[in-house]
Design a protein with these regions (language model features):
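A residue-level marker of the well-folded mature domains of exported/periplasmic proteins
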Residues: 1-208
């Protein structure tokens, strides 16, 4: 599988760099959106990103005007674009209607990012925020090209397939199966040894 904690960490680190949080005074306004609360991957996406961003929130360099920070508050049922759009329309009308700038949106994936982008198009007049995503959906890559989304995280299934072939060959040959993670995935009966492939950050500079 892919290293989903690293997906979130990559998104968080992108925002740190894009906002120059190490050097800039701030504060910067941030809003957060993740996926379905029943999807275990959300724990990794959200956890990886917040491990990076929480210190800046605690410091006051990042501010969340909506006050919605907890995973349960920022979840999106079924990862649905329309649900993401509806929530962000409410956030924008309640916190940004006076022209306050939204500086960044941590969106765990592209379907939620698209909902954010749709809400911004209809309900926002400030400077356009930096928005993250994941999956490199066609609509979102188009938005990256158009300057409406800063980045997405690409998980190359070819790399996944190649690793699966290598692992199956090892099993058939009676050799040791290559794994690089023996801590992350617990199915309730024990830890499942895994091989975590690395995702890639995609921006306007490398999307081709």
């Amino acid at each position: 599988t892919f290293d989903n904690y690293l997906v979130g960490k990559t998104q968080g680190e992108y925002l740190v760099d894009a906002l120059d949080l190490e050097n800039a005074d701030g504060p910067f306004n941030l809003e957060i959106i993740t996926g379905d609360p029943g999807d275990n991957n959300v724990n990794f996406f959200y956890g990886g990103a917040m491990d990076v961003l929480q210190p800046y929130i605690d410091e006051g360099k990042l501010v969340v005007p909506s006050g919605q920070i907890a995973k349960e508050e920022v979840a999106t049922a079924n990862w649905a674009t329309d649900a993401a759009q509806s929530r962000f329309e409410n956030i924008l009308s309640s916190n940004y209607a006076d022209g306050t700038n939204l500086d960044a949106v941590l969106a765990s994936n592209d379907s939620t990012a698209l909902g954010v982008e749709n809400a911004l198009a209809a309900n926002y007049t400030g400077e356009y925020p930096i928005i993250t995503g994941q999956d490199c959906d066609i609509a979102n890559v188009a938005n990256i090209v158009a300057g409406k989304q800063a980045m997405s995280v690409f998980k190359d299934t070819r790399a996944l397939a190649s690793q699966v072939v290598e692992m199956v060959d090892a099993i058939i040959s009676g050799e040791e199966v290559p794994v690089n993670d023996t801590e992350t995935y617990d199915n309730g009966t024990g830890i499942i040894p895994s091989y975590l492939c690395e995702p890639v950050a995609v921006t306007i500079d490398n999307y081709k």
